[in-house]
């Protein structure tokens, strides 16, 4: 999705049906929308926790397109033209942070040439309106991309588990009471949990 991208900062008023009026305004691209250089963050004032981003999906023939992207500390809704097709989290303050999350959003095969709009919310101004990465491709290509990005984690996990088991057997067999071995085993255990969480 290499553009052009437009943004609009703030909370959208509702129309007569209760839907955000800026969804339809994104389709017609009225005067309230401003161009920005994607993938950079839009130049926001920081006065509102909401931003709207919109672009047109490239006009291609798709079979089973999937939009893959990652976000950090943001909740959002995604609209295809004027229809909401995906939502993540609540667009209100939450007790706990959303952290970093990746999303695989299936799109209809006829999505080429249609407008894609994001309504984004965050209490972290430096994160609002920013994607860590984004790609639109066929489903098999997206799964291949995801596996390639996770190969370092997938290979490190079994090695880490084997090292933990070898060290545990060594300590139990020799009845070693040195705290250093306990700390090293704890490191391997926590590192394994981290690897599972990031993959």
For the regions a language model picked out, list residue spans one by one.
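Sequence/structural signature of beta-propeller blade repeats across diverse families
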Residues: 20, 36-46, 86-96, 101, ...
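Beta-strand-rich ligand-recognition modules
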Residues: 80-115, 120-131
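Hydrophobic alpha-helical transmembrane segments of multi-pass membrane proteins
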Residues: 154-172, 179-199
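Extended carbohydrate-recognition surfaces in non-catalytic/accessory domains of CAZymes
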Residues: 1-61
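Extracellular and analogous surface-interaction loops
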Residues: 52-65, 105-112
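Aromatic-lined ligand-binding clefts that engage carbohydrates, nucleic acids, or primary amines
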Residues: 57-80, 116-118
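Alpha-helical transmembrane segments of multi-pass integral membrane proteins
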Residues: 124-138, 192-199
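Short, aromatic-rich amphipathic segments at membrane interfaces
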Residues: 130-153
